[in-house]
């Protein structure tokens, strides 16, 4: 096992749109261009059992924000404990990588239940693990920043995910969950 290591990376995704007169207020054609994502990433391992990931997004909003800032302890094999700011383990796209999504739009459940699948600038903890090459499970707790009820009490989100993958080999995966 690697005791210490790090990698630096990033991604840049740009969007360009051309509108005909139907979609503009004045009836004229228009266009826009912007960076959907402009992310700088630093991740790695320390003391063999500790992983870290820090990502800053300089994208669409014009200001920078931490997309992820998390530390994971991997010493309880096969269970991992992650704490910090990260996307909850909600769907396949976020569980694998947002760099390599199969389509530009995520499934509708992300919009239908957005309160349970987004960190919303908050913090959380997640416990996840695998059993053989067949089962994966995770449980998470997140508290979104500025998400209080009318009495000022923080609203929390809880996620539970289970996956069964009867076929999981390079290039071929069949999974449920």
Could you describe each region identified by the protein language model?
Residues 2-177:
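Outer membrane beta-barrel
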């Amino acid at each position: 096992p690697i005791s210490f290591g790090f990698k630096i990376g990033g991604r840049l995704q740009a969007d360009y749109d051309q509108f005909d007169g139907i979609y503009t207020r004045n009836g004229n054609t228009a266009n826009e261009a912007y960076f959907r994502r402009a992310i700088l990433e630093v991740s790695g391992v320390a003391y063999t059992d500790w992983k870290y990931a820090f990502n800053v997004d300089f994208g669409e909003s014009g200001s920078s924000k931490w997309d992820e800032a998390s530390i994971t302890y991997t010493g309880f094999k096969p269970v991992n404990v992650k704490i910090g700011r990260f996307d909850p383990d909600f769907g396949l796209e976020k569980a694998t990588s947002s760099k390599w999504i199969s389509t530009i739009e995520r499934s509708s459940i992300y919009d239908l239940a957005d309160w349970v699948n987004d960190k919303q600038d908050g913090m959380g903890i997640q416990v996840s693990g695998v059993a053989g090459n067949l089962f994966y499970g995770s449980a998470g707790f997140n508290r979104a920043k500025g998400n209080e009820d009318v009495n000022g009490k923080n609203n929390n989100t809880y996620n539970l995910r289970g996956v069964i993958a009867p076929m999981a080999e390079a290039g071929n995966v069949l999974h449920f969950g």
